[in-house]
Amino acid sequence: MWASGSVKIPTHIAVIPDGNRRYAKKTGIDFYHAYKKGVEKVRNFLTWALEFRDIKNVTFFALSTENLQRSKIELEILFRIFEDELRRTLEDPLIHDNKVRVRFIGDRSLLPGKVVKYIDELESVTKNYSNYHLTIALGYGGRAEIVRCIKRVLSGEVRLETFSEEELFQCLDTRGIPNPEPDVVVRTGGEKRLSNFLLYQTAYSELIFLEKLWPEVEREDLVYIIEEYSRRQRRFGR
């Protein structure tokens, strides 16, 4: 597609897949089928990302702590879809053939037992994979993540006297994930904010906002993301 060395491909892409509910209203379909299409698009996006072998990490913001304040009916729809997708992913050739390690970040105590069961199983069956890394933020909030980290310090798990930026990374939900700082954060749906997503990890991430609603995203949009990222000069505050 590109001449060798002409494009700088990000190794870690984080995605805020916004716009499922607006897609339902726009197309006249119900929330269940809109969210179902949104979840299917996550798999599509991962498939496209794996075609670019330099993309090693993909992180999705699937459900925030704020999202948990939505109606009971909407949450039941979401959790039913999550259960179905997690169960299917346990035997997904896309994961196993490419040796994708799957991790989940967030507060699992906020999630239904069946969802947690499948999360644990999926993490277990992929724990020895290391070619690629897929991280799903579920029941996650960036501020809550930092609070959990502070509690670990106060409990004595980490020595306060030697506490450093690097040790803070080891307190966060993303500890153990190679390159936990996204090179680029992509948000669909036209909104231009992080919405409490990876607040510490995104200090120097490039931000790209797409007007398209998440279910409308296609492979050409990932190509645009890569090309736009390649045009940027990352200065890391210097």
Curated annotation (Swiss-Prot):
Reactions it catalyzes = geranylgeranyl diphosphate + 7 isopentenyl diphosphate = tri-trans,hepta-cis-undecaprenyl diphosphate + 7 diphosphate
Against InterPro entries, the record matches this protein to: UPP_synth-like, UPP_synth-like_CS, UPP_synth-like_sf
Q: Where does substrate bind?
A: 19-22, 64-66, 70, 187, 193-195
Question: What is the E.C. number?
Answer: 2.5.1.89
Q: Say which species the protein is native to.
A: Pyrobaculum aerophilum (strain ATCC 51768 / DSM 7523 / JCM 9630 / CIP 104966 / NBRC 100827 / IM2)
Q: Cofactor(s) for this protein?
A: Mg(2+)
Where does this protein have coiled-coil stretches?
Answer: none
Q: What class of enzyme is it?
A: transferase
- The entry's active site is 18, 67 (proton acceptor)
Name of the protein in question: Tritrans,polycis-undecaprenyl-diphosphate synthase (geranylgeranyl-diphosphate specific)
**Classification via Pfam families:** Prenyltransf
- Example GO biological process term? polyprenol biosynthetic process
Gene3D superfamilies of this UniProt entry?
Answer: Decaprenyl diphosphate synthase-like (3.40.1180.10)
Sorted UniProt keywords = Magnesium, Metal-binding, Transferase
Quaternary structure (record): Homodimer.
PANTHER family recorded for this chain? DEHYDRODOLICHYL DIPHOSPHATE SYNTHASE COMPLEX SUBUNIT DHDDS, DEHYDRODOLICHYL DIPHOSPHATE SYNTHASE FAMILY MEMBER
Report the function annotation for this chain.
Answer: Catalyzes the sequential condensation of isopentenyl diphosphate (IPP) with geranylgeranyl diphosphate (GGPP) to yield (2Z,6Z,10Z,14Z,18Z,22Z,26Z,30E,34E,38E)-undecaprenyl diphosphate (tritrans,heptacis-UPP). It is probably the precursor of glycosyl carrier lipids.
Q: How is the cofactor bound?
A: Binds 2 magnesium ions per subunit.
One example GO MF annotation? magnesium ion binding
Q: Which NCBIfam families match?
A: uppS
Question: Could you say which protein family the record assigns here?
Answer: Belongs to the UPP synthase family.
Residue positions binding Mg(2+): 18, 206
